[in-house]
Amino acid sequence: MGSYIVVRRLATQPKLAHAPKRKWKSVVGLEVHAQITSASKLFSGSGTAFGAPLNTSVTYFDASIPGTLPVLNRKCVESGIKTALALGCRVNEVSMFDRKHYFYADLPNGYQITQQRAALANDGLMTFPVITPGKKVYYKSVNLLQLQLEQDSGKSLHDEQLKRSLVDLNRAGVPLMELVFAPDLETGEEAASLVKELVLILRRLQTCSCKMEEGALRVDANISIHEEGAPLGVRTEVKNIGSVRSISQAISYEINRQLELVAEGGVVTNETRSWDAEHRRTVAMRDKEVLQDYRFMPEPNLPPLHVNLKPGSVSTQELISVAALSKEIPELPEHTRQRLVEHYKLNAETAIILVNEPVLLEHFLSITESLADVPTKVVTNFLINDLLTYCNKLNLDIEDYTTSDNALKDVLKALHAEQINLQAARQLIQLLHTNPTSSVSELIGQHNLQQISELSTIEAYCQQAIANQSKAVQQYQKGKSKALFAIAGEVAKLSAQKANMKIVVECLERLLKK
Amino acid sequence: MLRISARFYCKIATQSSFKAAEYKNKIKKDKKLNFTQLLHPTKVPQTPVPAAFSDPSENVVEIDTKTIQLLERLSLVDLDSDQALATLKSSIQFADKIAHIDTQNVRPLYTVLEKQQLQLRNDQVTAGDSRAELLRCAKVTDEDYYVSPPGNIPLEQ
């Protein structure tokens, strides 16, 4: 078997080498299902709490008992409209509900109530920064084709050994908004950046918790490749992507899989694949190998949903006013970035990093407010280069680094007053993490982190360093100014990283000039 | 064109001044269905609407044997007896009326309730925990789960 593969590879490779170099383009479109934050379900009065005991948040309607009827949850409509407005959509005056039929054990009705012919909103646009490690940040715009309200299905657990599925209907009927984006993306990083921005927006609007680990935000990606100038290729759909990081990995994997498949003379088939996070690959799924006919039909139990589009109108019990809801929309992430650039004179990339980590932004705003004399550059450098880097190194979510603003303020205060140096500040980030109850001044005292600024002590260190680094001293005196760093480094080492480097450099320059 | 009059719809259930007790008495007197069991107001007409259609009863329905066989296969209903055949023919004749209605220049409706506004419910938990009752309806359950045949799972598992 192994030798067969080798032979085949050898046989195809020369052909590839002779083939004219063709440019392949990848096309990615996303469908995002976001659970609308609500107390009760979309069409029934049962709760939506995550992790409720099995099958306890289920009304007769959710279990599809004959004679029950859907009644639409007002808050879900309002949240859908708010989200639509934030994403620049046209909200439709009349939208309708449809039944989408498919047969599955966790869908007791045999159909899902969704919006197909006339959705709540259409034609939005999302513009977001794309962050690719090691590349320049750029902005990308993607059209939002449709935003629709729909029900979630129940949850199936697959029991491999006993060849059966276990069904929990707690999730059946939970409100979702499905956002269908146009295939305007090209890479996994762009897709991940879109989702990241969407999460920021939905969290600001408080219309979705965006907890991917709870299934509150689910992303399906449609991926195809085609030659430049040729029509779009056959697409595959990747489901089951469980984190923002996986989005970029899953899509990059799938693009490469298709490119390799085509390079080997294969053909991409229209199929649903699942992302296997453990082995970092996409896997074909058994179902949906043939195109399904969902037999869409109007939902006869729900008259059309009307909203009031008149400017200046107010909401009534019967009719929701879009104009009234538009006033409730908070500042959106992109606006915050612009404000940071204009008001605090931050550069664009710093603003993007701060806004993308809401905790950092909170720290930044609170620190700059109370420590007005510390330059913003020092604050952002500390938060991004030191705090965020520390968390990334530990693979720790910045939101889980629990410390008070005050502790961070104290560190920055000490740093700014030259009581401690940057090395000590970095050490304090770690100490505050491991000793969350200690105060900064206590930690500085306990761990002897005070910066050494006394001239006499520093001069002694410098004399020692000059003696130790005679080679560097010679180079420096020959005019190689960079050699000073080696001597300064020696001072840092001798002083256990505690010397005030500004004074050290001044002192060294003075001593060596003599 | 579209002619929907307000009187087609259940006035009682949509009125906010609706008083259940008063209505109950009225039902007792009128011997009508008890609509007080509806939890939410409805937009569905609660009384039948009489409509006049032209009666195409002279169009006698004829069905060939092939069609009858097809219908039997599709419906799993035995149409061998004369009575069954007569019922089928009269059903078709009854439904045939609809084909003779003049629909020129009439925009198709998705629903007869198209001009109605959908009723909205406040976001409150009002029901839910009926697990014991609902699980009792299922044939196979295990530790509060419904049990079903295996569903779609990755091919390589």
From Swiss-Prot, chain B:
Its EC number is 6.3.5.-. It is found in: Mitochondrion. It catalyses: L-glutamyl-tRNA(Gln) + L-glutamine + ATP + H2O = L-glutaminyl-tRNA(Gln) + L-glutamate + ADP + phosphate + H(+). InterPro entries: Asp/Glu-ADT_sf_sub_c, GatC. One of its GO terms (cellular component) is glutamyl-tRNA(Gln) amidotransferase complex. The keyword Zinc does not apply. Coiled coil: none annotated. One of its GO terms (biological process) is glutaminyl-tRNAGln biosynthesis via transamidation. It holds the Pfam family GatC. Keywords: ATP-binding, Ligase, Mitochondrion, Nucleotide-binding, Protein biosynthesis. One of its GO terms (molecular function) is glutaminyl-tRNA synthase (glutamine-hydrolyzing) activity. Allows the formation of correctly charged Gln-tRNA(Gln) through the transamidation of misacylated Glu-tRNA(Gln) in the mitochondria. The reaction takes place in the presence of glutamine and ATP through an activated gamma-phospho-Glu-tRNA(Gln). PANTHER family: GLUTAMYL-TRNA(GLN) AMIDOTRANSFERASE SUBUNIT C, MITOCHONDRIAL. Belongs to the GatC family. Subunit of the heterotrimeric GatCAB amidotransferase (AdT) complex, composed of A, B and C subunits. This protein may be expected to contain an N-terminal transit peptide but none has been predicted. This is Glutamyl-tRNA(Gln) amidotransferase subunit C, mitochondrial.
